């Protein structure tokens, strides 16, 4: 094991000099020998003259020039397998839940090749979420990649928590949650919610169904850049065992942002909007590994923060290309008090195809979208001239569209503590029956207020009796 000396420290970036004949490879992990706590560096560049430039996987406070650094000769490895279940780990796979060592028998490198083309398998099996607007407009595929796009405060994390509640709790497989650069409070809440739901069992961790990896907002950019790979590595191990895995990443934008910080510290020339020049490649390396093989599947749900609500920003735009379904959250819908604030006109799914979902589902979804689109076009006319100037046909479209908008709302289980309304899981069959009746005009005489925050169409009819 060769050793070197720290020669320069610039924030989260450290230069280390090694003997000419034993320079570490890119992505090799280096250990700082004299550090008070375990401190790992990851090699990013070979500058020349035996000097390598590395990013710190932790705080660089207290580092100084001349400290001895050991080359491990291998990339960062993290514990994998059933011992990780029910535990909270950091980017290096160390336990941070004060429940003792992980004690895993196997460790995998966080840098791994994506499965080859021959190994990959695709599936058209649908994954029911119990959320009406998602199951109708942008259905998820088992083994697919789903993105939740939204600006600040429109409900990405709440929607993700509801999906975890509805899918992970009904789902017999295992889940991995990677908290990438998000609030520590949310990670804490999630941990205790999972305990209450019985998904995390502290007394018998082996009975737990979720492994958690956190690299939160207050951590250095190196941690936030690599924590997604740590979570993914654990999910890959479960997949290779032949299991169906759910991988939740909150938030993929922070992964990009950490890459931007590291890129600037490494002295690379920024590209569009100040992002790193390697943005597409870094995103591709992560996303290509999130895939299903013949042995098992990884279904991933990724929250994507949209800066300034601009979907054309390079970070969300780069993410779009890799996804099978996109759930777009809209601030205008949220401002009207309609939750979940999912935009049925912007959200898409490759599964919304008559050959996959069936002709009836496809027709209902497209008719809902065309009704809402026509209402959107008529809004300007209504604002200027009022409803009276519309034709009878358009008045009917507006009336039905407003009912559809209200019927797309639904109370969430995870929001029960804030709203006081019990959450509702709506089956796809009930969802299709409700919207089919609305489009056919079966409920034209029911007041639109009855459709707010109800589950099935029968609930709306019950509400109408109380109005």
Curated annotation (Swiss-Prot):
It comes from the Bacteria. One of its GO terms (cellular component) is plasma membrane. It is found in: Cell inner membrane. It catalyses: ATP + H2O + 4 H(+)(in) = ADP + phosphate + 5 H(+)(out). Its EC number is 7.1.2.2. Its main location: membrane. Keywords: ATP synthesis, ATP-binding, Cell inner membrane, Cell membrane, CF(1), Hydrogen ion transport, Ion transport, Membrane, Nucleotide-binding, Translocase, Transport. SUPFAM superfamilies: C-terminal domain of alpha and beta subunits of F1 ATP synthase (SSF47917), N-terminal domain of alpha and beta subunits of F1 ATP synthase (SSF50615), P-loop containing nucleoside triphosphate hydrolases (SSF52540). Pfam families: ATP-synt_ab (PF00006), ATP-synt_ab_N (PF02874), ATP-synt_VA_C (PF22919). ATP binds at residues 150-157. It is a peripheral membrane protein. GO terms for molecular function: ATP binding; ATP hydrolysis activity; proton-transporting ATP synthase activity, rotational mechanism. Coiled coil: none annotated. F-type ATPases have 2 components, CF(1) - the catalytic core - and CF(0) - the membrane proton channel. CF(1) has five subunits: alpha(3), beta(3), gamma(1), delta(1), epsilon(1). CF(0) has three main subunits: a(1), b(2) and c(9-12). The alpha and beta chains form an alternating ring which encloses part of the gamma chain. CF(1) is attached to CF(0) by a central stalk formed by the gamma and epsilon chains, while a peripheral stalk is formed by the delta and b chains. Belongs to the ATPase alpha/beta chains family. HAMAP family: ATP_synth_beta_bact. Produces ATP from ADP in the presence of a proton gradient across the membrane. The catalytic sites are hosted primarily by the beta subunits. This is ATP synthase subunit beta. It comes from Aliivibrio salmonicida (strain LFI1238).
């Amino acid at each position: 094991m060769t050793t070197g000396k720290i020669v320069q420290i610039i924030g989260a970036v450290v230069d280390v000099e090694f003997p000419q004949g034993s320079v570490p490879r890119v992505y090799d992990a280096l250990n700082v020998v004299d550090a008070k706590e375990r401190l790992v560096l990851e090699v990013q560049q070979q500058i020349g003259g035996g000097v390598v430039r590395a990013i710190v996987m932790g705080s660089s406070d207290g580092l100084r020039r001349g400290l001895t650094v050991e080359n491990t000769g291998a990339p960062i490895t993290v514990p994998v397998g059933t011992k990780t279940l029910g535990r909270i780990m950091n980017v290096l796979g160390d336990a941070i839940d004060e429940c003792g060592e992980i004690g895993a028998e196997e460790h995998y490198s966080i840098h791994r090749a994506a499965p080859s083309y021959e190994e990959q398998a695709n599936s058209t099996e649908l994954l029911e979420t119990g959320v009406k607007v998602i199951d109708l407009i942008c259905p998820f595929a088992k083994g697919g990649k789903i993105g939740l796009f939204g600006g600040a405060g429109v409900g990405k994390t709440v929607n993700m928590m509801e999906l975890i509640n509805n899918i992970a709790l009904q789902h017999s497989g295992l889940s991995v949650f990677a908290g990438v650069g998000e609030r520590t409070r949310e990670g804490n809440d999630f941990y205790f919610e999972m305990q209450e739901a019985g998904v995390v069992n502290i007394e018998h961790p082996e009975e737990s169904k979720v492994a958690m990896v956190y690299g939160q907002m207050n951590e250095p950019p190196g941690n936030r850049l690599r924590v997604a790979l740590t979570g993914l590595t654990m999910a890959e191990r479960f997949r290779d065992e032949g299991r169906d895995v759910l991988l939740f990443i909150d938030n993929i934008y922070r992964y990009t942002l950490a890459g931007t910080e590291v890129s600037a510290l490494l002295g690379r020339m920024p590209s569009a909007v100040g992002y790193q020049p390697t943005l597409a490649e870094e995103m591709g390396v992560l996303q290509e590994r999130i895939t299903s093989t013949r042995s098992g599947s990884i279904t991933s749900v990724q929250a994507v923060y949209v800066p300034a609500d601009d979907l054309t920003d390079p970070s969300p735009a780069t993410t779009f290309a890799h996804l099978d379904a996109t759930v777009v959250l809209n601030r205008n819908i949220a401002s009207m008090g309609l939750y979940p604030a999912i935009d049925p006109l912007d959200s898409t799914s490759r599964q919304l195809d008559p050959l996959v979902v069936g002709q009836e589902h496809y027709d209902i979804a497209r008719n809902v979208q065309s009704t809402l689109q026509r209402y959107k076009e008529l809004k300007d006319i209504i604002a200027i001239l009022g409803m009276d100037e519309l034709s009878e046909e358009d008045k009917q479209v507006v009336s039905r569209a407003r009912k559809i908008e209200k019927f797309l709302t639904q109370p969430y289980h995870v929001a029960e503590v804030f709203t006081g309304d019990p959450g509702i899981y709506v089956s796809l069959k009930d969802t299709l029956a409700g919207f089919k009746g609305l489009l056919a005009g079966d409920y034209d005489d029911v007041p639109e207020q009855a459709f707010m925050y109800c589950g099935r169409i029968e609930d709306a009819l019950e509400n109408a009796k109380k109005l």
